[in-house]
């Protein structure tokens, strides 16, 4: 959308993502053997595009690329699970809430939501995947959702007691 007059790029597809992950894995193995650290990490989006599970949090070695979004989903998943442990048992509610996220992370967020719904009887969470109309539909990460897209796509929806939107 904003690339008029620039060198043409094409979106990464499933095959590209799989090949990139193989390359990153080979380099990680070599660096781990030689330097004791993986040094390079694949973007979360590559795992999603390839349909592969995210590496465990330990594979990100304290998340040195977190500011670039590398490992953000693995860390969020880990923190989410830790937060669930703090809930204890016996909680009940009749609350309905909504979560807005990018289309890339939608299934991941839905899996976390189902876990918390099982833990808290009566809680109903609706996940809204937000299509990025501002930057273009191939931009599918939560951190690049605009307020305009949120408002446009959630307007008129019954969001329940609270709407949770991505921080990054």
List where the protein language model places each region:
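Auxiliary Fe-S-binding modules of radical SAM enzymes
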Residues: 2-168
């Amino acid at each position: 959308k904003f690339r008029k007059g620039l060198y043409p790029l094409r979106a990464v597809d499933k095959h590209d993502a799989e090949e990139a992950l193989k390359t990153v894995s080979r380099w990680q193995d070599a660096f781990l053997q030689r330097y004791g650290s993986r040094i390079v990490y694949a973007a979360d989006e590559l795992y999603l595009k390839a349909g592969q599970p995210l590496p465990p949090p330990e594979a990100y070695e304290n998340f040195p690329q977190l500011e670039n979004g590398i490992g953000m989903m693995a860390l969020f998943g880990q923190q989410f699970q830790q937060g669930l442990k703090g809930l204890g048992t016996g909680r009940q509610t009749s609350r309905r809430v909504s979560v807005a996220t990018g289309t890339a992370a939608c299934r991941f967020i839905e899996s976390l939501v189902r876990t918390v719904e099982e833990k808290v009887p009566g809680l109903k969470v609706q996940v809204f995947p937000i299509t990025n109309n501002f930057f273009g539909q191939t931009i599918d990460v939560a951190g690049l959702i605009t307020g305009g897209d949120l408002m446009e796509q959630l307007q008129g929806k019954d969001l329940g007691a609270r709407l949770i939107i991505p921080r990054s």
